[in-house]
Swiss-Prot record:
It holds the Pfam family GTP_cyclohydro2. This is GTP cyclohydrolase-2. GO terms for molecular function: GTP binding; GTP cyclohydrolase II activity; zinc ion binding. Pathway: Cofactor biosynthesis; riboflavin biosynthesis; 5-amino-6-(D-ribitylamino)uracil from GTP: step 1/4. GTP binds at R52, I53, H54, S55, E56, Q73, E94, G95, R96, T116, T151, K156. The keyword Nucleotide-binding applies. Its EC number is 3.5.4.25. Keywords: GTP-binding, Hydrolase, Metal-binding, Nucleotide-binding, Riboflavin biosynthesis, Zinc. It comes from Psychromonas ingrahamii (strain DSM 17664 / CCUG 51855 / 37).
Amino acid sequence: MTKVRTKISLKIGANSRIPAQIASFNGLTSDKEHIAIIFGKADECSSSPIVRIHSECLTGDVFHSSRCDCGEQLDEAIELMEKEGGIIIYLRQEGRGIGLYNKIDAYKLQSEGMDTYQANNQLGFEDDLRDFTEAGQMLAALNIRKLQLLTNNPLKVKALREYGITVDKVISTSTFIKDDNESYLRTKAKNAGHAIRFPF
């Protein structure tokens, strides 16, 4: 059974000004060191907190790469939860589960004309290797049984519902279009059903 291992308080975000808690876990089904970032008392209330399941993206989250919108989505979640409370489930699933080096290899193939899924397939991987079951385990360990999910990805909604967690509402993330990521976003919408709103 998954249980909270350690929970600490710290400040995060720009200028380290946003109070939050970081929780680690024992008993996850993989050896990945996933964490939960808790804002306010989202894990102590009986209502339906806002939750974002966010897969690690070093190039986007840390270096704000122009190739994706991951960093902007993470920043948006932090800003929203600073005001409303909530929980970010941060999963160590770099490159939709293929790892950082393989993702960089995939980027090279994309530069040669492949889309994000074709590149993964060329490297011998499926379109998306992520499993969101552990997100359900972590939320259950935090006593979260119902929530509002901040996502454009229907697979995350499906995974939580299959785990027995009630998704009261799906909140779409904003669309962050940059010169280098429009094709990537349109491919996710077309191939994986992401509910991305394009202005044109």
